[in-house]
Amino acid sequence: MTANTRYAMFFASLVIPCTAAIAGDANPYVGRWALTIPGGGAGWLGVTQEDGYLDGSILWGGGSVLPADWVFMADDSLCVFRFHKVERKNAAGKVVRTQTLPEVIMAKVDGDFLQLTQIEPNRNCVGFEQREFTGKRIPPLPAKPDLSKVKFGMPIALFDGMSLDAWKLTDENQKSGWSVEDGLLVNKPVQPQGGRHVSYGNLRTVAEFEDFNLKLEVKVNKGENSGVYLRGIYEVQVADTYGQPLDSHNMGGVYSRITPSVAAEKPAGQWQTMDITLVDRHVTVVLNGQKIIDNEPLLGCTGGALSSDESKPGPIYLQGDHTGICYRDIILTPVAK
């Protein structure tokens, strides 16, 4: 039997009516799952039981949390479909056909763990890729913390204005655009004119932290885009979004997860203050003196996370692979144990 024949039989089997073995019982797939996707990156899967159907959303490495196109049970396995539009062009570059290629992720639960298989046809429709990966159930969220009762330790200056000794790239194989200029932490990911694209790196603290308050100042020039990752897991967006409608991708939002309650960003080119508190998987963001996220729960990692495991300490990391950016006065105060 050829690989293509097995692939065709696999998809045929998914559309044959079947009775879920767990029908009538609590569905063990419902909940939130931290994924370690093929290649070791961070992902996330959320499965919900709606009135008469299953639904879900997924984060695959970078980008945003997106709705799954189709979620259903096949016997005791969970199937998650994502559909990808592929444009077919002729020799002149004109689009002559748009196809929809399916990608399926099949999951098998074992207690609090998932074994998953991703099957995706090649874009030339010859053969397919099959990848194995794993998931772990995310524990229920703790109760919303009473921040007035949280005790903090001594402040730590993460950036001393003189060196990058307390920092390193998240990927040492990438090029660094980061430097210290006049006491400021500056990123300049300059691309060569007409040359090959250079992959610039993100900057992280050498030290790792649990819960904390983080204060910093950032100057976002026109069109610039960065981000502040809490414990390397949750991105608080830094971007030139002044005057735009409220969106989770805007300045101060938790990227694709939590939309600010009010637009508090300043016009491009001005220094802005961020005051971020992370306690018990709840986050508060004060931007330029205005509270825009108030002790909201974090449902999982965001795109670009170093890890999907929310139980571990992690670094502060600053996104530097997009555009230039400038930071100063980065002070972290840990929660006292």
Protein language model annotation of sequence segments:
Residues 1-6:
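N-terminal secretory signal peptides that target proteins for export/translocation
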Residues 8-19:
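Bacterial N-terminal signal peptides
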